[in-house]
């Protein structure tokens, strides 16, 4: 009986041992399989700070990528690329045309100064400036020339020599003479020629166009509306009109791309440009001239300011649909 119990105990313990070994074996295999799987997955992955995608061309903060074909492209929200090379080329060509007009008008203006034709020079003064005002988004790239042509007296720094349109403006309207304008006139022609020659070297981008259009409206809000731009001649409405024309030209060039992305924005901008132009037309004298800015009432000035501000808000959205 004792031998039987001892054999049973041994067999029982052996059975328990086998069960334990089988369980441990299964657990070990599972653990080993999990470990192998983990290591395999880890081996197939690279650290997060080492991207696996091919290195792309440098991208600027504004989303613009240089391309291999030399054209400008903007990455849109839906991850497609918008080619703006045709638009930037068209805008640059238009500005080059404006520079031709600017030089021609400036030469006529200076010829009147040299001939002592005061009233004729005063009449041409605002018209001669308009091509420059339309083209400021590109003209301002050349920071040394812009102030030489367009600096206001209020913007002069200590010891700075004043030249350009506004220096001549002050003499014509405060001294009522052309005397003292000869050197200023010759310098103005030289500066305009230099600007005209430099325009073809300018790098024109979609961002410059969009930001330039908005800046033209901001300029109206900050200097034209207040009457600070043409403080002596009171010809601010000519500059006002030229700035609107410059911004509208950019909008027109970009319209096909905008139409494909946001047709409602095109409709809104078209209407709001028309509102501003209609308001300006109410202050027109004859076909090409405008009344002196100081003849506008406070309500008329306010109406212009509000129309420009309402135009500026959707105009700034052009960049959103192109990037």
Where are these regions (language model features)?
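Intrinsically disordered/low-complexity terminal segments and short unstructured peptides
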Residues: 22, 37-39, 51, 59, ...
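Post-signal peptide N-terminal segment of mature Sec-exported envelope proteins
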Residues: 52-74
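Gram-negative bacterial Sec-dependent N-terminal signal peptides
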Residues: 21-45
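Intrinsic disorder/low-complexity segments enriched in polar/small residues
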Residues: 10, 19, 23, 30, ...
